[in-house]
Amino acid sequence: MLGTIVKKIIGTKNDRELKRMAKLVDAINSHAEAMAQLTDGDLQHKTEAFRQAFKDGKTLDELLPEAFAVVREASTRVMGMRHFDVQMMGGISLHEGRISEMRTGEGKTLTATLPAYLNALSGEGVHVVTVNDYLAERDANWMRPLYEFLGLSVGIILSQQPTEHKRAAYAADITYGTNNEYGFDYLRDNMAFRLEDRVQRGLNYAIVDEVDSILIDEARTPLIISGPAADSSELYQAVNLLMPQLQKQEEEGEGDYFIDEKQRQVELTEAGHQKIEALLVNNQLLEQGESLYAAHNLALLHHVHAALKAHALFHIDRDYIVQDGQIVIVDEHTGRTMPGRRWSEGIHQAIEAKEGLNIQQENQTLASTTFQNYFRLYNKLSGMTGTADTEALEFRQIYGMDVVVVPTNKPMVRVDANDLVYLSLQEKFDAIVKEVTEAVAKGAPVLVGTATIEASEYLSKRLKQDKVHHEVLNAKFHQREAQIIAQAGRPGAVTIATNMAGRGTDIMLGGNPEEQIKHMETPSESEAEKIRAEWQANHDTVMKAGGLHIIGTERHESRRIDNQLRGRAGRQGDPGYTRFFLSMEDDLMRIFASDKIRNLMRSLGLENGEAIEHRWVTRAIENAQRKVEGRNFDIRKNLLEYDNVANDQRQVIYGQRDQILEAADLVNSVKGIRRDVITELVHDYMAPGSVEDQWDIPGLEKTLEAEFQCHAPVGQWLNEDNQLHIEGLIDKLVESMDEDYQRKEAEIGTEDLRKIEKHLMLQILDRHWKEHLANMDHLRQGIHLRGYAQKNPKQEYKKEAFELFQGLLNQIQHELIRVLHSLQVRRDDEVERLEQQREEEAREQAEKMKMQTVAEPGTDGSAQPQPSQQQGEQPKTMVRNGRKVGRNEPCPCGSGKKYKQCHGKIE
């Protein structure tokens, strides 16, 4: 009560925002007369003047009044459309990183030109985000004349577009595209091996159209680029057959490999290296005279290490069991089996080969993110929609964005009738058919909104039985959809549409004459005038019939979806009528309406076909919707905390990739990593603070020699110098390994070694990151079970994910130094062969790569079907297939270069 009184006295927060923006609109309007006096050339010159002013230190906020006035004047001249004052308010809130709630028909597309122009002046790019390719193309081409008149370039990104076209589109001042494509391009850029293979140039400012759909409904939909893991079944089996021929080294005796029980590691001895190379040559897995450590044989070396570990370290009925033809891991702490979990680094496949089982090829996640996490990367994010206020709390808490409800240009005269509630579905649909028939008889156009495809098909069947001509909309063909919606305002037109179908296109009363003219083959002026005259007559008929008639066949869990349907009617001050028809058998009523309402309806003695209609019932339903919205928000908020863990890790890895790609050379990085690896290794064998009797000097020497080809006499150094402490020993080892590496550099050549370092660092980082993503998936899927042990699954997930990530970073560093110090380049063309190998891998991955959005996980982190998925719809999956490209053929990216000189070249 007190809150209501205060609001009446000082106004709501939204009222205060509108008052503040009204002053800015007055400042914009004060420039109108001066702008109207300018020639076209002078008006166009303003853009360059603004850019210079920005470079000289003026802020975009300071430039806003005059810049908005320039856009409005240019739009009037070029487009024949002048921005209303309320559109100026919408533009101001978008520039300030807020969400503008603007009713359908209020001109959101034109409104977006104001902040898009202003923010493009910085030269850092503006991304306009739409829900499908059709709207991206339509809006970009519609507004292109205005932007180009003002000297700004416009780009469009579409799926299946060549890389060069995409790069050019992103380089434009203003870029239009879909949320999916922006997200996938971000992921692909973070898989690139060269800077020139990237397409995006930074995430500066985004204007998201239908922001509620993208940032709420699809917020947690994962964007995943996946591909089948390389099928190396035959190689695993072939290498497996060689392992029994290797002998374990006992103490200091002879042998081919030794086991470090403490570190749970196994390494080949010098004799073992020679023996395995001979065996590989005999089995035609390695060419005669080649080294297993040659750069292009690293994959084979990886298989040998995996097979050796499978035979020496992992034992049946201790580490794993064989169950139903599969390897099932046994938890070393609890002794319980862990179905569905797999060891990484090829060990699981090597054990499958060892036990004579089918080697499973998995679909591997190469990169992933969610819309929620992707859009939070922008320096500034804004959005517009007809329905956002009901989700204002979520926008503020998750994205830090306030919602500004922009008033309509003309007063709203739409009639929103109370809901009609029937006892059964049959009675409800009978009433809907009757309502449609009566509205058509009056000459009113009717739009019927359904929640599912099944309901729309059932209603279509009923209308056909009554011989009512109608159109059914689905979301498969955007071009067709827009045409149907454009003409859905003709007298007596009946259109059935599911939830989201047709968003982005206004329903004009009487139909859309310009759309009709556009689809005619070279219409004469007289034909065009005739169509416009027909439209005027149709428009008058529809206005007399009360405007567009909206019928909702059921309430959704979210009031926002209901408001989207209602918002179709009453555009720009037009008349309109909306009503929802419900039944006690609808999902929302069945689940959330109390038995009291059902019993009340029965006690009223309602006859067949009678409905209950009262504002109390409508209010009770809205209260039920609020509760559901609150519950869904809590679920999304809870899940975001899980997502944030993976997102933080992704930013670290992608940041490291950026540094590798952008670095001229990695000499200092490799030196730093080498010191970190040696420090960790020494501390493993000579724990800080321990006494000398606890040190394992022979183990350290053996590991240094086996893993890093470092023949350092650690024991001798310590005997010769009593003052040599652990840190001094680390310095001595690092110095020794630096000298070894310098000799290798002289042997290979500085330029070639720099290329190999960059290539290997990216390759190792990517491989371990892919394995880490799989490990995180496995952790996520089972984490909810911790709740049964009275543990907090969220805290357990964060703790274990951190441990996994620490292990990942250590593995990457360790393997990089091991491979670089073991590397042997014996032939002049070795680096070129390495490049060719990388080209082949990249091409095969691109051919098999899938871009997909998949079902979201459950509240506890486990996988579950996506609840918003409509019956009959499948998660969107885009697959790229193509024939293999020869090295001397043009690169399929569209660069015009030969394939070997483009994708895959290590620079």
UniProtKB/Swiss-Prot annotation:
<dbReference type="GO" id="GO:0006605">
    <property type="term" value="P:protein targeting"/>
</dbReference>
<dbReference type="InterPro" id="IPR011116">
    <property type="entry name" value="SecA_Wing/Scaffold"/>
</dbReference>
<feature type="binding site">
    <location>
        <position position="893"/>
    </location>
    <ligand>
        <name>Zn(2+)</name>
    </ligand>
</feature>
<dbReference type="Pfam" id="PF01043">
    <property type="entry name" value="SecA_PP_bind"/>
</dbReference>
<feature type="binding site">
    <location>
        <position position="891"/>
    </location>
    <ligand>
        <name>Zn(2+)</name>
    </ligand>
</feature>
<keyword id="KW-0813">Transport</keyword>
<keyword id="KW-0997">Cell inner membrane</keyword>
<dbReference type="Pfam" id="PF21090">
    <property type="entry name" value="P-loop_SecA"/>
</dbReference>
<keyword id="KW-1278">Translocase</keyword>
<dbReference type="InterPro" id="IPR000185">
    <property type="entry name" value="SecA"/>
</dbReference>
<dbReference type="InterPro" id="IPR036266">
    <property type="entry name" value="SecA_Wing/Scaffold_sf"/>
</dbReference>
<dbReference type="Pfam" id="PF07516">
    <property type="entry name" value="SecA_SW"/>
</dbReference>
<dbReference type="InterPro" id="IPR027417">
    <property type="entry name" value="P-loop_NTPase"/>
</dbReference>
<comment type="similarity">
    <text>Belongs to the SecA family.</text>
</comment>
<dbReference type="GO" id="GO:0005886">
    <property type="term" value="C:plasma membrane"/>
</dbReference>
<keyword id="KW-0067">ATP-binding</keyword>
<dbReference type="Pfam" id="PF02810">
    <property type="entry name" value="SEC-C"/>
</dbReference>
<comment type="function">
    <text>Part of the Sec protein translocase complex. Interacts with the SecYEG preprotein conducting channel. Has a central role in coupling the hydrolysis of ATP to the transfer of proteins into and across the cell membrane, serving both as a receptor for the preprotein-SecB complex and as an ATP-driven molecular motor driving the stepwise translocation of polypeptide chains across the membrane.</text>
</comment>
<feature type="region of interest" description="Disordered">
    <location>
        <begin position="834"/>
        <end position="907"/>
    </location>
</feature>
<keyword id="KW-0472">Membrane</keyword>
<dbReference type="GO" id="GO:0031522">
    <property type="term" value="C:cell envelope Sec protein transport complex"/>
</dbReference>
<feature type="compositionally biased region" description="Basic and acidic residues">
    <location>
        <begin position="834"/>
        <end position="850"/>
    </location>
</feature>
<dbReference type="GO" id="GO:0005829">
    <property type="term" value="C:cytosol"/>
</dbReference>
<keyword id="KW-1003">Cell membrane</keyword>
<feature type="binding site">
    <location>
        <position position="902"/>
    </location>
    <ligand>
        <name>Zn(2+)</name>
    </ligand>
</feature>
<dbReference type="GO" id="GO:0017038">
    <property type="term" value="P:protein import"/>
</dbReference>
<dbReference type="InterPro" id="IPR004027">
    <property type="entry name" value="SEC_C_motif"/>
</dbReference>
<dbReference type="InterPro" id="IPR014018">
    <property type="entry name" value="SecA_motor_DEAD"/>
</dbReference>
<comment type="subunit">
    <text>Monomer and homodimer. Part of the essential Sec protein translocation apparatus which comprises SecA, SecYEG and auxiliary proteins SecDF-YajC and YidC.</text>
</comment>
<feature type="binding site">
    <location>
        <begin position="105"/>
        <end position="109"/>
    </location>
    <ligand>
        <name>ATP</name>
    </ligand>
</feature>
<keyword id="KW-0653">Protein transport</keyword>
<dbReference type="GO" id="GO:0065002">
    <property type="term" value="P:intracellular protein transmembrane transport"/>
</dbReference>
<feature type="compositionally biased region" description="Basic residues">
    <location>
        <begin position="897"/>
        <end position="907"/>
    </location>
</feature>
<feature type="compositionally biased region" description="Low complexity">
    <location>
        <begin position="864"/>
        <end position="875"/>
    </location>
</feature>
<dbReference type="GO" id="GO:0008564">
    <property type="term" value="F:protein-exporting ATPase activity"/>
</dbReference>
<dbReference type="InterPro" id="IPR011130">
    <property type="entry name" value="SecA_preprotein_X-link_dom"/>
</dbReference>
<dbReference type="InterPro" id="IPR020937">
    <property type="entry name" value="SecA_CS"/>
</dbReference>
<dbReference type="GO" id="GO:0005524">
    <property type="term" value="F:ATP binding"/>
</dbReference>
<protein>
    <recommendedName>
        <fullName>Protein translocase subunit SecA</fullName>
        <ecNumber>7.4.2.8</ecNumber>
    </recommendedName>
</protein>
<feature type="binding site">
    <location>
        <position position="506"/>
    </location>
    <ligand>
        <name>ATP</name>
    </ligand>
</feature>
<feature type="binding site">
    <location>
        <position position="87"/>
    </location>
    <ligand>
        <name>ATP</name>
    </ligand>
</feature>
<keyword id="KW-0963">Cytoplasm</keyword>
